């Protein structure tokens, strides 16, 4: 994202052809960092990007800003106005912009990854802070009622997406988009950082607008099953949860095998940096969770796979993991979900299924990509406590 030229295609799915670098008003070519394009209702095109501004007398130090440009509609690599500073790092006032895992640096923080949303005539810039690699990475909002390049003020309901604990955290560098039924949805990245420092996954959550026109996530950054945008399900104002909860998180399972340092409890510790890994000679790796004193009505599952041994250069590439999830009702094991014939590569595989009454659950891995040792970063089943005779 540091060097982003413009590409053009006849279809949203491509193919795309590079148009080259952008051309500033003085004719100098440049490539923006974290650019976002926006077309206003009148057809005028704008671009927003990160820009560092050097601090005089302090070598190597700079202030983070977001700048905006108006582009030539007939040749959109050419700037006709800008750069105009629309957001400037303000770490003394905005605690979420302060660098560090505990927002401890009051003098610096990244203000990056801008995205422009226009909703009900108001311009919103969604941006990310303070650092891609920390769990407090988040998105916040400035808005303007004047226009796409002027008058932006920091909204009071910041940050927009913020969660620092659990598997789903560091919800930054994303956007807010319109969805079905005039709804709004935040899309954000989640740091994984297992294979690469900037490795990420993508999450999404419902966004609402308060009485002052400020954006907020009514359920926050969620980690439990939610209704999809097109779900025809009656929900309350700002309500999007199915109300199913994790029933095995932080419980310690038993495993058919494991290698030293990759014990089975790593499959439920809510960390993207750890995983359970079975032994190489385990032909059907199995994890089994007892649900302690409880009996649960289990309705959904999520598996986050670890592709140990992945090596594109050597021809070891991703592929489908095949598995079966079973429940134990106190008398016998039975199938909750059968993915033994899965042909789709899903690094994170979420499924819902017919409810099963369970005192224990297990996952049996029955197939995996050639050359890869299967591992599980997270195995979670979702449900509610079951009481016989109660709804």
Locate predicted features.
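Predominantly extracellular/luminal regions of secreted and cell-surface proteins
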Residues: 64-80, 87, 231-269
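Beta-propeller and closely related beta-sheet repeat lectin domains
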Residues: 33-36, 112-115, 172-175
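Aromatic, loop-rich ligand-recognition surfaces of beta-strand-rich domains
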Residues: 269-337, 347-391
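Beta-rich carbohydrate-recognition and catalytic domains
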Residues: 1-33, 40-106, 118-166, 181-183, ...
């Amino acid at each position: 994202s540091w060097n982003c030229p413009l590409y053009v295609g006849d279809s949203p799915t491509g193919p795309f052809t590079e148009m080259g670098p952008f051309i500033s008003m003085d004719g100098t070519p440049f490539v923006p960092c974290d650019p976002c394009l926006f077309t206003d209702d009148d057809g005028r095109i704008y671009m927003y990007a990160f820009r560092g501004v050097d601090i005089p007398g302090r070598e190597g130090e700079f202030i983070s800003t977001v700048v905006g440009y108006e582009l030539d509609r007939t040749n959109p690599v050419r700037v006709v106005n800008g750069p105009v500073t629309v957001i400037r790092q303000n770490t003394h006032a905005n605690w979420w912009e302060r660098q560090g895992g505990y927002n401890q640096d009051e003098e610096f923080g990244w203000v990056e990854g801008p995205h422009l949303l226009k909703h009900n005539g108001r311009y919103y810039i969604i941006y990310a802070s303070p650092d891609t690699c920390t769990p407090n990475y988040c998105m916040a909002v400035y808005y303007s009622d004047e226009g796409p390049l002027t008058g932006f003020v920091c909204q009071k309901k910041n940050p927009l997406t913020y969660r620092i604990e659990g598997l789903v955290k560091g919800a930054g560098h994303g956007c807010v988009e319109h969805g079905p039924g005039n709804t709004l949805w935040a899309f954000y990245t989640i740091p994984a950082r297992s294979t690469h420092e900037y490795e990420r996954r993508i999450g999404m959550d419902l966004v609402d607008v308060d009485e002052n026109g400020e954006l907020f996530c009514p359920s926050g950054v969620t980690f439990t099953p939610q209704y999809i945008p097109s779900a025809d399900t009656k929900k309350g104002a700002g309500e999007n949860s199915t109300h199913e909860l994790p029933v095995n998180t932080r419980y310690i399972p038993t495993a058919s095998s494991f290698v030293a340092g990759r014990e089975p409890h790593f499959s439920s510790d809510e960390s993207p940096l750890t995983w359970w890994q079975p032994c190489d000679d385990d032909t059907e790796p199995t994890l089994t969770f007892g649900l302690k004193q409880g009996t649960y009505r289990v309705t959904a599952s999520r598996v986050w796979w670890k592709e140990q041994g992945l090596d594109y250069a050597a021809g070891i590439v991703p592929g489908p993991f095949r598995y079966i999830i079973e429940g134990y009702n106190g008398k016998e094991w039975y199938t909750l979900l059968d993915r033994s014939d899965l042909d789709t590569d899903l690094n994170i595989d979420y499924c819902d299924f017919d409810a099963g009454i369970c005192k224990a659950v297990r996952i049996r891995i029955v197939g995996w990509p050639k050359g890869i040792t299967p591992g599980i970063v997270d195995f979670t089943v979702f449900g509610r406590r079951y009481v016989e005779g109660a709804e």
